[in-house]
Regions:
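NAD(P)+-binding Rossmann beta1-loop-alpha1 motif at the extreme N-terminus of oxidoreductases
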Residues: 1-59, 68-69
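Hydrophobic anchor at the start of a short beta-strand
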Residues: 11, 33-34, 131-133, 177
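Rossmann-like NAD(P)(H) cofactor-binding subdomain of soluble oxidoreductases
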Residues: 61, 67-150, 166-168
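General beta-strand structural signal in soluble alpha/beta enzymes
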Residues: 107, 132-137, 177-181, 239-240, ...
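Internal alpha-helical scaffold of NAD(P)-dependent oxidoreductase catalytic cores
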Residues: 123, 127-131, 150-237
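NAD(P)-dependent Rossmann-like dehydrogenase/reductase catalytic/cofactor-binding core
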Residues: 193, 200-204, 229-239, 243, ...
Length: 333
């Protein structure tokens, strides 16, 4: 990788799930040479079909998109973007580091490090010291990006030059990336909104209505902001695309896996039964545990997160959880 302001001409996307594939399609349409990396059997299927029939059926790959199972070849691109679940993020970075040091790295993974319960940038900085780091986050459903529907995201990096370079690469006819220097806040917004989406799904699944959903979104935003500020993020970040934008989308639309997890839990399904129905990774299940422990460590009050954690990991009845939220002591907003 180089740190110049020259345009990106090639990019390696690590992770061939729905979001990684959608970003690969977007960037290839923008004219970049794209290599999409995943498991060998997965890549063989994508190469043969020239589409991701499992996650994005009916959306053909552009000519410039090449599925590739050879990591050493993929990381030779101008840029590398990691789009794997947060649970696999550390291991994938170690695999890259074993091949070559990077001067820059970006990711579109939404989650916290499962070992440290901190934003992924801290892990990335330890593995690639001195590298420019960036995260891409915002209100995005993979299928809509792949279909070319209008979308806006945030590209956050401590290097303004790097975030601008990525934003330019991502810019398309229907896709826009705004830049930010608040890499911590943008990551937290993308990770913790998944917990709130589970709560919104539970509330809607129990029939509590639109008023309750609006309250959950608003108070959920307050929780995310408190946690972010405690970790050094800017409060205004959470009013942007990676905060309020992503939170609103994920809490209100059934394309959201996390919202669907909440709906399934409200039906009485177990976590494993809900996962089997959704058939994709549900980041909010992990984020609930990591966020709850982090809030306890930092002394940040996060009542919605606490109730979601108790439902997922302590077997609390969702009806009881909602009652406990409503019966908390009176306080000023």
């Amino acid at each position: 990788m180089n740190q110049s302001t020259e345009a990106v001409t090639s990019i390696g996307i690590l992770g061939a799930g729905s979001w990684g594939t959608a970003l690969a399609i977007l960037l290839a349409r923008n004219g970049l040479e794209v290599r999409l990396w995943g498991r060998e059997e997965e890549i063989a299927r994508l190469s043969a079909d020239r589409e991701n029939r499992q996650f994005l059926p009916g959306i053909p790959f552009p000519d410039k998109l090449t599925p590739d199972a050879t990591l050493s070849r993929v990381v030779e691109c101008d840029e590398v973007m990691v789009v794997v679940p947060s649970q696999a993020f550390h291991e994938v970075l170690l695999q890259i580091a074993a091949i070559k040091p990077l001067q820059s790295l970006c990711w579109a993974t939404k989650g916290l490090d499962p070992n440290t319960r901190r934003p992924l940038s801290i892990d990335a900085a330890a593995i690639f010291p001195g590298a420019d780091l960036a995260v891409i986050s915002g209100p995005t459903f993979a299928v809509e990006v792949a279909q070319g529907l209008p979308t806006a995201v945030t590209a956050a990096s401590t290097s303004e030059r790097y975030s601008e370079r990525l934003a330019e690469a991502l810019k398309g006819e229907t896709f826009r990336a705004y830049t930010s220097t608040d890499i911590i806040g943008v990551q937290l917004g993308g990770a913790v909104k998944n917990v709130m989406a589970i709560a919104a799904g539970i509330s809607d699944g129990l029939g509590f209505g639109a008023n309750a959903r609006a309250a959950l979104i608003t108070r959920g935003l307050a929780e995310i902001t408190r946690l972010g500020v405690a970790l050094g993020a800017y409060p205004e970040t959470f009013m942007g695309l990676a905060g309020l934008g992503d939170l609103t989308l994920t809490c209100t639309d059934n394309k959201s896996r996390n919202r669907r997890m909440g709906l399934a839990l409200a039906e009485g399904l177990t976590i494993e039964e809900a996962r089997a129905r959704i058939q994709q990774e549900v980041e909010g299940v992990h984020a609930a545990k990591e966020t709850w422990f982090l809030s306890q460590e930092l002394g940040v009050e996060m009542p919605i997160t606490t109730e979601v954690y108790r439902i997922l990991y302590e077997g609390l009845d969702p009806h009881v959880a909602v009652r406990e939220l409503l019966h908390r002591r009176q306080r000023a907003e």
